[in-house]
Structure formats: structure tokens, C-alpha cells
Amino acid sequence: VSISMKSILAAAVASLVVGNAMAADGTINFKGEITAAACSITGGAGTTVGGAAGNQTIDVSLGKISIDSLGGTAGGSIAGGTSLNLNLDCGKTGTGLTTVKLKFDPVSGTGIDSHNESLLKLGKDSTATGVGIGIYGSDGKLLNLSANETINAPLNSNTEKDGEGNDITVYSANLNLRAAYVKSGAAAATAGIANGSLPFTLEYN
């Protein structure tokens, strides 16, 4: 018994030594910048925007869509849907920046659909099944929410007069996207309430 135990101990020590021999130390360096950019959002028809810049809520009405008009599970077609033409007014805070990215955080919202990871999962207050919410870019392509795909737009500059008649440069951007219900999974969809929540962040470069 003692010999067997020594053999096991020796093997364990040898394994530990090899593990240490293969170990290596390193450093991860993080680089970034905190910008002063603070853009307020206004929305187009079908959207209601509330709250102050930096903490705004956008309510979108997707309307009433019949089951037989839902897009397929691949998300290649848009069933009705609502355009979200978001206009960003950044004032003078966009100096030195060229691009704004709309990044989504579905996990902090109602989640990612279990049958199609490109889609937003319906919330717990929903009674419809077999349906998710798709976000489309201006090119009509379905975004993959689980892959952190973004909606990007240039940050445009324009010269205006301030209250004293001096020229100032102000910045704005237009983020054009569309939201729609999409069939999810192989099972037949059922009718009912279909709500979802999708937190977002505006990132500037």
C-alpha cells in the first residue's frame, strides 16, 4: 500500500513540476479614452423617446402582425416592422470624433432567443410563442445580437452661430435601423402579447 501511495505522490509531483515549467507571466495593457460626447436622441414616426441625454428610453410600436406574415427563422424577410430613424444631436461634444456606434446588450434586457441567437427574446410578460424580435440595419440585413454586431454612422459636423454670433462647430448623426417580429424555432407560432427590452450604448470613435 505504501509503495502505491508513493507512486501516486511521485506522479503528482512530476505533474506539478511540468505545470510550473510551462507557466509564463504576462501583462495585459488596456488603452482607451473617456470622451465628453453626450448626444441626445430623437426618433422618427413609430417611436417615443424619453429621458435625458445619456439615459434615454425609446419606446417602439411594432403593431399587430398576423402569424402567417412573420419572417422565416433565418430572419431574411421583414414582416411589417417599424423604422427606428434615430437622430443624434451631440452639440459641441463631438470634437475630434468621426463615428458613432449603436451597441446592443440583449443579455441585460429580455435576453437572446434560444432558437435563433440573432433575435431578441420576448419578455416574461409576453404570451406569444415561437416569435422573436429582429433588428435590421439600413441595408435590410438582420443583425446577430449574440455576436455584438453594431449599427454604425458617421458623426457629421456643421458650423452654426452661437448666442454671441461666433462660429461654432456642432455634431450630429443619423442611425437608421428597423425592428420586426421574426418566426423563431420549428414549432408553430402562437398569438399573444409580444414585448421585448433591448438596452443599448452609444460608443464614439
Model-flagged regions — what are they?
Residues 10-16:
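Bacterial N-terminal signal peptides
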Residues 2-6, 19-205:
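Mature extracellular/passenger domains of Gram-negative fimbrial/pilin and adhesin proteins
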